[in-house]
Every structure is written in C-alpha cells, then in structure tokens.
Amino acid sequence: MSQNTGKKSLVFHLIFWLGSVCLLLLDQWTKYLACIHLKDRIPVSVIEDVFCLQYLENRGAAFGILQGQKVFFVLITLLFLFLVFWIYHCLPADRRFYPVYVTMMLLLSGAVGNFIDRIFRNYVVDFFYFELINFPIFNVADIYVTCGAALFFIVFIFVYKEEDVNEMGRLLFPWKRKDKNGK
C-alpha cells in the first residue's frame, strides 16, 4: 500500500492542467469552426450515408433529454467540478493513480467545454452525426466525457484491486470511521 507522497510536483501540475486546457481548447475550437462553417448550412457528408457534420444547438443533455434545464445542468456541472477538484487535491501523484488523473482530465475538459457553451450561448453546439445508425448529434466534449467514463469503469473493474479502491477511499474521505478491525 502506498502512502500519500505529499505535494504534487510542478511537472505533475503542469501536465494535468495544461493537458486539461489543451483538451478544452480543442473542444472550443471545433465548436467555433462548427459555428462558422456549419451553422445555417446543409450537413457536410464525410462518409456518404454513414457520417456527416451537421450543426445542432442542443439545449438539453446527452441525446437531447431534459431540454431547457440550464439551471439544473449548471448546478450539476458545478457539483461535478467540485468533486474533480476534491479528488485532485486528495489523491497523491502516485503512479498507480495516473489512470484516475487521465480520467479526470477527460471528464473535466468535457464538462467544462459544455458548461462554457451553456453559460455563454444558452445551448451546446453539437455537430458530429452518425447517419448510418441515426446516433444523436454530439461534439468533442461529449467524446471526452464518454471516453473518461469508459476509462473510469475499465480501470475500476479490470485494473484496480480492492486494496487500491479502499486506499483511494481512505485518501478521499479521511474523516470516514475505521471499522472494528482498524481498517
């Protein structure tokens, strides 16, 4: 079992935060391009009848559910961001926890990317559309959230052992009572 190794190095902070900012900037840049090149235009076919770029102003969540619930999404996003910052603060820069940090970078960048849209546009710009399966239109931030969530489940199901998860629990919730065995 590893111990909390103390402060994260400057390099660690730079990799995490610059990585997150780069992902966020990529998301915002693609949305900017979608607004300029796709808005009020016919969809652009990338692969005929399979995949196209189609502008959509999504005022809901994934798949367009919960339309017009901006306050709800803002509050949920703020709560989620608090959780990410808490995890970042509590977990050590231990190599074993790097997959958690990568997951957090993806989830943070995706959540903030769509949060920015909701705050400044009152909708989220979506533009990727898989026609072949009529999949709901999505964006780069949605890809980050999906990949981050998938990585989270893969890591916690196939990589981490019970001891690792228990140690993370102790690091994240230090006020939690110990059981009768002192664990």
Q: Which role does the model predict for each range below?
A:
Residues 1-183:
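Alpha-helical transmembrane bundles and membrane-interface segments of multipass inner-membrane proteins
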